[in-house]
């Protein structure tokens, strides 16, 4: 029944959009004042996505264009419907943070049918003719996480707590992490006692997965957590087991995580400048809507095509460089962190 309903819904979406598919992709020539940008976000449950939304919207408006953001609360059907609504409203370009990398291919299909280009933001939409991808070097994120943990401990029982399996970035983080860990595993220095994705990036699920391991093995030497949310869940589990202070990685430089770094319960996070990402994406969105050429620095294969891509550099953050990184960049203030 569910499959039938989804099928009917998608058919309806395409039928509605068919009425307005009057121009081939890229043939419009608009001024900034005429541009209408649609921003479809997976969720606003995590702290960082509020920053993306606010910075992106502000930059689009500064460029003289209009923008509307819709968040799907982690629901694929809702995200497809929101994309459909924006297309029906006549957006000139669609920027998408996909909940599910595969299912979101339908959004690209609908947008192209309506003559609208699609930018995949932060997370890559797979198996679709995505027009442009902007993100960070996500394999490098995983490498940075492991490298910093190895500065503290390079032998023993390690856990890998990944992100959502439906998120292409989660796979890239893991690939980067394992590329550094593998030689240590091969020579027997490191034993992986947990290697699981975390449904929906949910900190509670990360905590549960960690607690299951700790119920059988109260000897964990380090945890590679894919982001700050999962790190928070892991640290709660470790603390309950009397293991607070075990090296734990993270990502996103969330305020709660940076405070944990100061307190010594989290070892590091990875700062990905949301200012840089959101502003860059906003400028590109307006340029694409105006049919201007975009310079990219590489391509990333999404299973179907080599997607023109712009990848920004992530930055590792520890207790030693908080002031030189996230505070200097204006992302957080000393008062935020230390009060």
Residue map of PLM features:
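Sec-dependent N-terminal signal peptides of Gram-positive bacterial secreted proteins and lipoproteins
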Residues: 1-18
């Amino acid at each position: 029944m569910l499959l039938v309903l989804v099928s009917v819904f998608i058919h309806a979406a395409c039928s509605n959009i068919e009425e307005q598919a009057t121009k081939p992709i890229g043939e419009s020539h608009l001024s900034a004042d005429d541009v209408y940008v649609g921003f479809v976000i997976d969720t606003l449950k995590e702290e960082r996505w509020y920053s993306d939304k606010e910075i992106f919207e502000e930059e689009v408006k500064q460029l003289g264009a209009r923008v509307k953001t819709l968040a799907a609360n982690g629901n694929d059907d809702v995200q497809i419907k929101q994309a459909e609504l924006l297309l029906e409203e006549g957006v000139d370009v669609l920027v998408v943070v996909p909940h599910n990398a595969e299912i979101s291919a339908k959004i690209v299909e609908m947008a192209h049918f309506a003559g609208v280009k699609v930018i995949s933001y932060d997370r890559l939409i797979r198996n679709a003719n995505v027009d442009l991808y902007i993100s960070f070097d996500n394999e490098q994120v995983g490498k940075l996480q492991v490298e910093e943990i190895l500065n503290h401990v390079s032998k023993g029982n390690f856990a890998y707590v990944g992100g959502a399996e439906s998120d292409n970035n989660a796979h890239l983080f893991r690939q980067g992490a394992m590329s550094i860990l593998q030689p240590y595993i091969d020579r027997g220095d490191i034993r992986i006692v947990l290697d699981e994705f975390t449904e929906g990036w949910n900190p509670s699920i990360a905590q549960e997965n960690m607690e299951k391991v700790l119920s059988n093995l109260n000897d964990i030497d380090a945890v590679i957590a894919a982001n700050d949310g999962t790190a928070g869940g892991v640290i709660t589990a470790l603390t309950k087991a009397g293991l607070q202070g075990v090296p734990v990685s993270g990502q996103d430089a969330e305020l709660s995580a940076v405070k944990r770094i100061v307190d010594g319960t989290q070892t590091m996070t990875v700062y990905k400048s949301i200012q840089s990402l959101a502003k860059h994406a906003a400028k590109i969105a307006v340029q694409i809507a105006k049919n201007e050429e975009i310079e990219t620095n590489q391509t990333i294969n999404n299973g179907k095509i080599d997607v023109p891509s712009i990848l920004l550099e992530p930055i590792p953050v520890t207790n030693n460089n908080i002031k030189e990184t996230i505070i200097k960049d204006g992302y957080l203030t000393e008062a935020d962190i230390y009060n």
